[in-house]
Amino acid sequence: MDTITDIQVLKDTHKINGPEDLINKLPSIVGFKPSNESIVIVNTDIFSDYIIGCKVISTLDLFDLLEHVNDISNDVGTILCYYTNQKLDKIRPSAERLFDYLNNSINVRDVLYIRNNRWGSFICFDEKCCPTRGRVIE
């Protein structure tokens, strides 16, 4: 699997219109389709929905992820996208702990999961917005 070792600052900003648009655009932004057991860290302009940088990590290991996010400043918004084939109950606790930990020091806008051609949020509990079973990726 391809891995970007540092946050890749993008030459062009990419406007996103919500989580599904982000998930659909990520393969072209990072240059390949993220696969199971990877996390994409998306940095956005803190006041807008423009992507300014991305990083792909080829593990769901919480400690590996923490190493990579320690250098993110408060001046960016961060969205974490988990690509997984595991049952969500297995990774939800670590995703929620990660959100709690990171949100004390950086602006975490969302923690998304992508599984079996569906996406959802680990931190949004509004069934109209983010149903528990996720939304089909179109």
Where does each model-flagged region fall?
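Short beta-strand scaffold segments in enzyme catalytic cores
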Residues: 38-42
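Charged, compositionally biased boundary regions
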Residues: 2-30, 35, 48-49, 54-60, ...
